[in-house]
């Protein structure tokens, strides 16, 4: 059972009693804080489609990435309190507005409050949009409720994960989590250019870290049938927050860096 009272929702397993006002790594309370619920057109085309993804951006995060592009939401507790009933109403409003899916963005640390809002089952796919740093036990509570998993796989390099996200165990945690996601939803199902089921793994190429990216792609190629899991290789790294003072992360990636990783992706036929 997912519970705030001895919180082990994420791999940090802080064990704090959030119902008593204690705060763990994510610094979140025992109720939802959400920053935004709106149609979102800037996800992968298979997710946003023509009509937008019904995205709910939850405050807080189980990671603390030095380069986070949503730091106000993820690290500065921006957002307003939302009940499970209000969250369900937001889902229904977004569906009425024509969304292609309901997109839960960084939801893990609020799951005890989110799960009631997912019942009864929604008439559109549910997307679980996360940083990849997930507990397998927590993910198992989502089986049958989530249709599409949209995790990051940020790091194959543990030292890099420690330096940039305070998570030296990220590679093994994300590996186990993504395997569980795939076990639940299986290979990609695409209907009318819209994803209805499956896993898309996102990877952001970081400056000066080509080997980290190649390691991520190697892991994907080694663990899934070709084209069963989709890969979204992202180039939009921008120095933000602490990264501005942390070379080489104080610069954008070069076209040559991105092309080197993209060529390897094609070589692996991902």
Give residue ranges: language-model regions:
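Iron-sulfur (Fe-S) cluster-binding modules
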Residues: 1-9, 13, 230, 251-270
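N-terminal [4Fe-4S]-dependent radical SAM core
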Residues: 1-62, 66, 70-75
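Electropositive phosphate-/nucleotide-binding environments in soluble metabolic enzymes
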Residues: 4, 8, 20, 59, ...
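Long, low-complexity, intrinsically disordered polar/charged segments
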Residues: 39, 50-53, 58, 64-77, ...
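Short, conserved acidic/polar surface loops in the N-terminal third of protein domains
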Residues: 66-70, 76-81, 114-117, 138-141
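Conserved alpha-helical substructure of the radical SAM core
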Residues: 72-101, 264
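Flexible, glycine- and charge-enriched loops at secondary-structure boundaries
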Residues: 80, 84, 167, 171, ...
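Conserved AdoMet/S-adenosylmethionine-binding subsite of the radical SAM
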Residues: 89-247
